[in-house]
Curated annotation (Swiss-Prot):
Protein name: Aspartate carbamoyltransferase catalytic subunit
Pathway info: Pyrimidine metabolism; UMP biosynthesis via de novo pathway; (S)-dihydroorotate from bicarbonate: step 2/3
Residues spanning the signal sequence: none
Gene that specifies this protein: pyrB
Organism, as annotated: Desulfovibrio desulfuricans (strain ATCC 27774 / DSM 6949 / MB)
Subunit and interaction comment: Heterododecamer (2C3:3R2) of six catalytic PyrB chains organized as two trimers (C3), and six regulatory PyrI chains organized as three dimers (R2).
Binding site for L-aspartate: 92, 176, 230
Lineage: superkingdom: Bacteria
C-alpha cells in the first residue's frame, strides 16, 4: 500500500465527478490501485483510519453501494455505522437538516449519503464541517460508481484511456451512473456513445459530448467496452416503453453484439442486472464480463475516497 504524501487533496467532500480535475482523478485511481493489494491479502485490514468514524446515511435503498462502503471503512479500521430512513427520525417527520446536524454532533469524520432528491448531498455538505460523500442523489450523480467503473476500465485497457470508445446502453435519461461516467471518462479522453430508445434518451442529449444511437448493432461496432444500465421496470408503467419483450429484442446485449466490438472488449453493469432484459445470460457469464471486477474495484476505490476525505485535515498530504 502506497499513500503518496506529495499530492494535496483539495476537496472536503466528494459530491460529483465534475469537481475533480484530471490530476485528482488519476491520483485517486492510483491510490485505489494501492488499496486493491490489501484486498488480496490473507488478513484484509490495515490500521490506516483507526479512530476515524464513517456514517453510512442511506435514505434511499441500497445494497451494493452501502455494503461496499462498509467493507471499505472496516478494511481501513474505521468505525462504521449505518443509518437508514426507517431507523432515523426522518421517519417521524424530522427535517433532513436536523437529522444531519444530529449526526454531526456525534463528530463523524465522513458521512456517506444516499438520497432520492437531487442535490441532497450538497445541501448536507454545506451544513456540516465533516466530509460528505454522495452515494447517489436522484438522477443527478453517483461519483464513486463512475470512479470504480473508471478504475475497472483502466485495468482492462492497460492504463490507457486516450482513443478508447465506450458504449453506454439503456435508460440514459434517468441514470445518474450514465451522467457521472460521461463526464469523468470524457475528461480522460474516452469517446462515449449512448444507445437507447428515444423515450429513454434525455432532452438535449444531442448537445452532450456523446454520439447518439438507437440501433444497438450500429452502436456497438468497434467499441472498446459496453456499459449496460439497469432498466427500471417502472419506466414501462410510466408509458416510456411499449413492451419489455420489444425492449429486450432491440436492446438486450448478447454475444452476437459483442462480436461486432473490438477484440477483447469488456462489458460492465452497475447492478443489479435484469438478465434477459438488459443483458443475456450468456453475455453476463462470459469471460468478457467485468461485473465482478467492478465489485472488487468498488471496495478499493471507496477505500481511497474515505482515506482522502478522512485524513485531509490531519496535517499530511495524500
Amino acid at each position: 500500500m502506497n499513500t503518496d504524501n506529495r499530492y494535496h487533496w483539495p476537496h472536503k467532500d466528494l459530491l460529483d465527478v465534475t469537481q475533480l480535475s484530471r490530476a485528482d482523478t488519476l491520483h485517486l485511481l492510483d491510490l485505489a490501485a494501492s488499496f486493491q493489494e490489501i484486498n488480496s491479502r490473507p488478513v484484509k485490514k490495515v490500521p490506516t483510519l483507526k479512530g476515524k468514524t464513517v456514517v453510512l446515511f442511506f435514505v434511499e435503498n441500497s445494497t451494493r453501494t452501502k455494503t461496499s462502503f462498509d467493507v471499505a471503512g472496516k478494511r481501513l479500521s474505521a468505525d462504521t455505522f449505518a443509518l437508514g430512513k426507517s431507523g432515523s427520525s426522518l421517519n417521524k417527520g424530522e427535517s433532513l437538516k436536523d437529522t444531519a446536524l444530529t449526526l454531526q454532533a456525534m463528530s463523524p469524520d465522513v458521512i456517506v449519503m444516499r438520497h432520492s432528491s437531487s442535490g441532497a448531498a450538497r445541501y448536507v455538505a454545506d451544513l456540516l464541517p465533516c466530509g460528505v460523500v454522495n452515494g447517489g442523489d436522484g438522477w443527478h450523480a453517483h461519483p464513486t460508481q463512475a470512479l470504480l467503473d473508471c478504475f475497472s476500465l483502466r485495468e482492462a485497457w492497460a492504463n490507457s484511456f486516450e482513443g478508447r470508445t465506450l458504449l453506454i446502453l439503456g435508460d440514459i435519461a434517468h441514470s445518474r451512473v450514465a451522467r457521472s461516467n460521461i463526464h469523468l471518462l470524457t475528461s480522460l479522453g474516452v469517446r462515449i456513445r449512448v444507445c437507447a430508445p428515444r423515450t429513454l434518451l434525455p432532452a438535449g442529449v444531442d448537445h452532450w459530448p456523446v454520439e447518439v444511437y438507437t440501433d444497438l448493432r450500429q452502436a456497438v461496432r468497434d467499441v472498446d467496452a459496453v456499459m449496460c444500465l439497469r432498466l427500471q421496470l417502472e419506466r414501462q408503467q410510466a408509458g416510456l416503453l411499449p413492451d419489455l419483450a420489444e425492449y429486450s429484442r432491440r436492446f438486450c446485449l448478447g454475444l452476437e453484439h459483442m462480436a461486432l466490438a473490438r477484440p477483447g472488449a469488456g462489458v460492465l453493469h452497475p447492478g443489479p442486472m435484469n438478465r434477459g432484459l438488459e443483458i443475456s445470460d450468456d453475455m453476463a457469464d462470459a469471460p468478457a464480463s467485468l461485473v465482478l471486477d467492478q465489485v472488487a474495484a468498488g471496495v478499493a476505490t471507496r477505500m481511497a475516497v474515505l482515506y482522502l476525505l478522512a485524513t485531509r485535515n490531519d496535517g499530511g498530504r495524500a
